[in-house]
Amino acid sequence: TEKSGNYVADLVSQMMSYPLENIIDQPYAIEQMDTQAINAKLAEMTLANVRILLVDDKAKTDKKTKYFEAPYAVHKISEQQKAKWLNFSQNPELKLPALNPYFATDFSLNESDKSRLKPQLIEAEQGTQIYAMPSHYFGNEPKAKISLGLGITPKVEDLRQSVSATLLGYMSDLVQNKIDFQASIAGMSASVSMAENGVVLQADGYTQNLAKLLKDKMVLFQQFTLSEDTLAQAKQRYLEALDRAEKENALRQANAVITRFSSYPYFEMAKQRAMIEQISLADIQQMREKLLNKATSLRVLAVGNLSDNQVKQIATEVETVFNNQNSQIDLGRYLDINQSQRKLNHIKQISHEDNALTIAYFPKGYDELQGLSRASLLKDILSRWYFDDLRTDKQLGYVVYAYNTRIGTTSGLQFSVQSPTASPKEIMQHNERFFKESLAKLNAMSTEEFEKYRASLLEVLQHKPESLDQEFAEFVTDFSRGNGQFDHKAKLIELIKQLTKQDILDFYQQTIIDQTGFVFASQAVGKNPKISQVAELKGFEKVESVEALQKGFEIKRY
């Protein structure tokens, strides 16, 4: 199981109260059974002693609590009610539930190639790639994780199809509840996620019934009845999700603007709302047929206790439900800002009292790993300084942090503050002061201190995964980019080892101080008029529409 500080702390706490051999099972360990005491408790469990709590927004009340004025009522249980409850003649016949079909009974391990330290391409065709490896760190566990992506080329950028796919996803989730619950009880999970240009299937857990779980999920997606009632529920969920996004706290709303810009293609919320109302069951049916029949590629990544033949068999099972034309692999697209020098400022009025400002700085011209290595190390250095300055010393806001971020293949630094007392204008003034002071601190940093920061980052990157999920995650970026060498992380580590203090200074000077690359500021302005002054950023373009903004940038393929 994945380790955590809370888990370790809990074990230490148990050691103070129980013998070492019982620190895990102590809630279930008993030395003797007191039958008399148990029977005495059971004898008290009668209708005469019962207390029933009913929570219902339609319940009739006649009292209020003293301090919070919460409405409530107290009623005695009538003799007629008791008699009705004790009449068992109308009770349905009780039956044991059907056996969970996903419980594992075979925990044997597959014979595997222990020398395979990264996923290996075990099958390749024009529109098919299958990568697999046994777990290097958890090879003694009968578990695996597998991801299967079906892509459709050429890709479309169509609002109706995008909304239809999202609604179909909600509808599918509604009918998959039983399978998902059974799988979770059996120590497994699986998902079918979709967009207008493809489907991703994922499953993890004990391997004995993993293929069956995936097959059941796929077949249910293929065959479930599309009804007006389910569509109405899906539309409600979609609208509720849009409503939640509009009611998020100030900083989340500010950050969401940059996230939406980086996620191509994006459609404005107002357009999504209008389209939701137009979608019919025919649109949903067309989308399902498209996803089931129009795939042009299948890409698979499996890590864990699955043999190569088992992985291939799962892929074959997928293609019995989702038709793969096996014609073209497309690894996806991204918004390219690498050469951009545009400065953007998005301002949004929100219904909260708080304000938030988040601003992201990106360099110009760095390749992906060169930029990522510098941004990662600078984040480790600046994040504590930023928090100590704006949060601890200046008490500017209760949410203050700096971190490295990425749009497409370009990495940069992002600074975020949410404040109940400062306007976006004041936050930006403190940012500018902090940036200048930090440049001086970076220049004055000793070689020894710089080496400590670098060693700390390398230790984190070289830390062994603590779960199969973490081990799988190490390969996801390379897999999604089509890098069959799976050496993205190894190259990043080598670059960080070679970084000098001057490399960091140059990156900071160009990115933050001189702002030679792309900059995106996002302000969420609350309704408190005393602190509603926006940051007027010289030379920045005002952004009115993220959807329109995306059209001004080149879209590239990985």
Model-based region annotation:
Residues 41-51, 57-60:
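Extended, domain-scale alpha-helical bundle/helix-rich regions
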Residues 3-26, 56-58, 72-167, 326-385, ...:
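His/Glu-based metal-binding/catalytic segments typifying zinc-dependent metallopeptidases
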Residues 133-137, 187-191, 286-289, 345-349, ...:
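Short beta-strand/turn micro-motifs at beta-sheet edges
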Residues 1-38, 51-53, 140-223, 231-278, ...:
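M16 family metallopeptidases and their MPP-like homologs
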Residues 314-329:
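Glycine-centered hinge/linker elements that transmit conformational signals in sensory
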